[in-house]
């Protein structure tokens, strides 16, 4: 006797409802492969963590103003950790988020390459960034004195670098493989080209840095050894030429913003791509990790040579604006000033090269303070470039106009903060008045004000 199994209509309906159940808001947020959503998350958290990093840097300035009044023995550790956080928790993910959100739209691609990998990149970066921030608070981060917190900072920093590298792979693959049929690389917009070049340089730069964090973990290093590992193995990321790598997308943002503002394309786009490529070559700094690489002919060539593409881009921007009828907007002002801040970083490299010339007594400038000045200039340029991109592509990113009152209010704060922070550190390194209490307090006040304005 055969039995025929049947399901009631109610069971069938409930099964269908379960199959068609829409994912919750949390599930959509975590599992989204939409490139604009991922990009917005990178941009938003990048701005927020950059602000926190600058606030921490400003606190070290306030501590100097009060003659080491409340941070005790931690100013050096907090200043170094703030600069590392500003780069890898702030400006790099910020510009990466701009690329993830905008580049597919520029190329006419419906999505970014490896969307799940891009999502994984963001959540890994966010979780690791939170752990790194906690380690800083516990006297870890970089140059920290607590053993457990220092190890936690080293591991979390390595995870941050891995996550950013994964995101860079997604962007580079999108530019290489998701272009429409017939579009050559020579025809891609400025941001797409700069993002491709930036991704390539990030992979080789961050890959070398990841190796040093792995050595710190495998070697079971204590706080003192990890501090030495950072100074000798990762400190090169905070000085030229390597620090310029993190601002490569700023050049592409400036190109696209100027094209829109002037209403005309640049006459020679191939020359602009050459300028971005030359900048990237001269920003490659993994070869200059050891202190012995400084004060060499090659290092001096890189320090002075980076000026050429920056001046070339400024000249191209000026010529384009002169021939067109530019519409002045907050994005245009921020993008131009961002390139000028890169010029400030290049001038800081000149000072360092001249100071190290011969026996290193020409200026007697502080190498550590000069490196901080370069980091400040580059970080300021990246923040201004990221803000310019956020305003310029505001309809695509946020669904509203970028020429708002809030956007206009951010311009003076960012311009003054970026210029003041870098210039203060540059002047402080040259005049060498650290031994005088009053001068030390004045410089501390200016650093606090500059970092505070950028944080706002």
What are these regions (language model features)?
Residues 2-456:
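Membrane-embedded and interfacial regions of multi-pass energy-transducing membrane proteins
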């Amino acid at each position: 006797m055969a039995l025929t199994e049947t399901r009631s209509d109610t069971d069938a309906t409930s099964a269908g409802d379960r199959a068609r159940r829409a994912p919750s808001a949390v599930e959509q947020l975590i599992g989204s492969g939409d490139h604009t959503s991922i990009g917005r998350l990178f941009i938003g958290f990048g701005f927020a963590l950059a602000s926190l990093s600058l606030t921490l840097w400003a606190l070290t300035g306030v501590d100097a103003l009060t003659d080491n009044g409340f941070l005790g023995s931690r100013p050096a550790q907090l200043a170094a950790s703030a600069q590392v956080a500003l780069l890898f928790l702030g400006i790099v993910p910020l510009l990466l988020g701009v690329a993830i959100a905008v580049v597919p739209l520029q190329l006419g691609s419906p999505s970014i390459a490896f969307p799940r990998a891009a999502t994984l990149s963001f959540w890994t970066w966010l979780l690791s960034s939170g752990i790194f921030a906690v380690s800083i608070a516990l006297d870890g981060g970089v140059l920290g004195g607590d053993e457990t917190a220092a190890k936690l900072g080293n591991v979390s920093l390595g995870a941050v670098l891995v996550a950013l590298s994964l995101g860079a792979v997604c962007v580079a693959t999108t530019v290489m493989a998701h272009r429409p049929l017939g579009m050559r690389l020579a025809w891609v917009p400025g941001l797409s080209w700069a993002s491709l070049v930036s991704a390539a340089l990030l992979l080789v730069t961050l890959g070398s840095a990841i190796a040093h964090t792995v050595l710190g973990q495998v070697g079971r290093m204590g706080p003192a050894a990890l501090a030495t590992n950072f100074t000798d193995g990762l400190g090169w990321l905070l000085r030229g030429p390597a620090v310029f790598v993190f601002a490569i997308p700023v050049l592409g943002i400036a190109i696209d913003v100027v094209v829109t503002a002037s209403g005309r394309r640049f006459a020679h786009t191939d020359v602009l791509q050459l300028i971005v490529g030359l900048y990237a070559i001269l920003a490659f700094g993994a070869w200059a990790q050891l202190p012995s690489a400084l004060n060499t002919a090659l290092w001096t060539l890189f320090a002075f040579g980076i000026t050429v593409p920056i001046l070339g881009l400024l000249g191209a921007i000026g010529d384009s604006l002169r021939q067109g009828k530019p519409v002045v907007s907050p994005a245009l002002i921020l993008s131009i000033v961002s390139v000028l801040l890169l010029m400030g970083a290049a001038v800081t490299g000149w000072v360092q090269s001249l100071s190290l010339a011969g026996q290193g007594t020409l200026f007697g400038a502080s190498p550590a303070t000069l490196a901080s000045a370069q980091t400040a200039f580059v970080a300021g340029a990246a923040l201004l470039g990221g803000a310019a991109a956020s305003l310029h592509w505001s309809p695509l990113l946020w669904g509203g106009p970028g020429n708002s009152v809030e956007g206009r209010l951010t311009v003076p704060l960012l311009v003054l903060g970026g210029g003041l922070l870098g210039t203060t550190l540059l002047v402080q390194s040259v005049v060498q008045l650290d031994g005088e209490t009053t001068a030390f307090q004045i410089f501390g006040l200016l650093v606090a004000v500059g970092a505070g304005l950028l944080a706002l």
